From Swiss-Prot:
One Pfam entry name: ACP_syn_III
Subcellular location: Cytoplasm
Keywords: Acyltransferase, Cytoplasm, Fatty acid biosynthesis, Fatty acid metabolism, Lipid biosynthesis, Lipid metabolism, Multifunctional enzyme, Transferase
Superkingdom in the source lineage: Bacteria
Descriptive protein name: Beta-ketoacyl-[acyl-carrier-protein] synthase III
Subunit structure: Homodimer.
Active site as annotated: C120, H256, N286
Domain notes: The last Arg residue of the ACP-binding site is essential for the weak association between ACP/AcpP and FabH.
Organism annotation: Deinococcus deserti (strain DSM 17065 / CIP 109153 / LMG 22923 / VCD115)
EC number: 2.3.1.180
GO molecular function: 3-oxoacyl-[acyl-carrier-protein] synthase activity; beta-ketoacyl-acyl-carrier-protein synthase III activity
Family annotation (HAMAP family): FabH
Function: Catalyzes the condensation reaction of fatty acid synthesis by the addition to an acyl acceptor of two carbons from malonyl-ACP. Catalyzes the first condensation reaction which initiates fatty acid synthesis and may therefore play a role in governing the total rate of fatty acid production. Possesses both acetoacetyl-ACP synthase and acetyl transacylase activities. Its substrate specificity determines the biosynthesis of branched-chain and/or straight-chain of fatty acids.
Family: Belongs to the thiolase-like superfamily. FabH family.
Length: 350
């Protein structure tokens, strides 16, 4: 990749697409195979239903469909893109990278491509990394994809995890935006001491303490909840302070969609009403790295997110990891316009 020095460019999201699979799995569907009921699931998590990928639909497939949704809105969205980041913990394979497979299918052969694994923090991490590549003069524009097929790596008979997760994908292009718009600051971090609280056993056997080998995601829900409430508030506050902002300046908090109780606790920490955040986990569950772009796309399509608004992005995930970012939303690109008839809520078809 080659690009001119861009250290003073204002950078932000210049294109955005989303995809969710067609299959809807409701809380009631879990009642027949585990000790639970639909009302209990919703009261504990805020989730009513989620989407599951088809049998032969994988992360790269969904990432491609999110990019296709972007191109449907703006056929020129991939112009000058010379790097691809795919944030995922459910890659098609350990190698080749899912990012490379997506690039092959959307006409970006030759672009740098790599996967990023910070679980639910991944998409916002990816925005920060993409900005760094551009500011370093290494890339001109960067495609950031957050995509997951969590239904395939979660034990569907385990009440502690099966009820939480869904599948989906979002895709954004990071590039130059007009001065005064775009990303302001990011705060990123991780603490491996909490690695045993949220993990994928088959790739976690070398972590301190060790884990039994297996095929499914494991989670200590109580510990993750306490961690999330703390780091979302801390990192969000730090990002605002770095940007010279306060919570009074924030139009929308865009949180990772893990659990409505976590979001409520974070908003209380910020001293902001729930009307200042956007929630869609009731319909999609926790899609890990896809949650933030899915929320952004929904907020654009229904007209809540508008040009010039101040956003605070917050997420946490495996690692344990956390990230927060501030940005002044730029709505000037074709794919960033409202689309109330958007197909992604019912599954964009590639």
């Amino acid at each position: 990749m080659t690009a001119p020095s861009a250290s003073r460019l204002s950078l932000g999201i210049v294109a955005l697409g989303a995809y969710t699979p067609e299959r809807i799995v409701r809380n009631e569907d879990f009642e027949a195979r585990m000790d639970t009921n639909a009302a209990w699931i919703e009261s504990r998590t805020g989730i009513r239903e989620r989407r599951f990928a088809a049998e032969h639909e994988y992360t790269s497939d969904m990432g491609v469909r999110a990019v296709q949704d972007m191109l449907r809105r703006d056929p020129q969205a991939l112009t000058d893109v010379d790097a691809i980041i795919c944030a995922t913990v459910s890659p098609d394979a350990l190698m080749p990278s899912t990012a490379a497979l997506i690039g092959m299918q959307v006409g970006l052969v030759g672009a740098a491509a790599f996967d990023l694994s910070t679980a639910c923090s991944g998409f916002v991490y990816g925005l920060s990394v993409a900005s760094g590549l551009i500011h370093a003069g290494t890339a001109r524009r960067v495609l950031v994809v957050g995509a997951e097929v969590l239904s395939k790596i979660v034990d569907q008979d385990d009440r502690g995890t099966a009820i939480l997760f869904g599948d989906g994908a979002g895709a954004a292009v990071v590039g130059p935006v007009p001065e005064g718009y775009g990303f302001q600051d990011f705060v990123l971090g991780a603490d491996g001491n909490g690695g045993s609280s949220l993990y994928m056993r088959s790739v976690a056997k070398q972590l301190p303490g060790g884990f039994a080998m297996g095929d499914f995601t494991g989670m200590n829900g109580r510990e993750v909840f306490k961690f999330a409430v703390r780091v979302l508030g801390d990192s969000g506050t730090q990002a605002l302070e770095k940007s010279g902002l306060t919570t009074a300046d924030v139009d929308w908090v865009i949180p990772h969609q893990a659990n409505v109780r976590i979001i409520e606790a974070a908003m209380e920490r910020f001293g902001l009403p729930m009307s200042k955040t956007i929630i869609n986990l009731d319909r999609y569950g926790n899609t890990s790295s896809a949650t933030v772009p899915l929320v952004l796309r929904e907020g654009l399509d229904d007209g809540r997110i508008r040009d010039g608004q101040q956003l605070l992005l917050i997420a946490f995930g495996g690692g344990l990891s956390w990230v927060a970012g501030t940005m002044k939303w730029w709505g000037g690109a074709p794919s960033l316009q409202p689309d109330r008839a958007a197909e992604h809520s019912a599954g964009v078809q590639g």
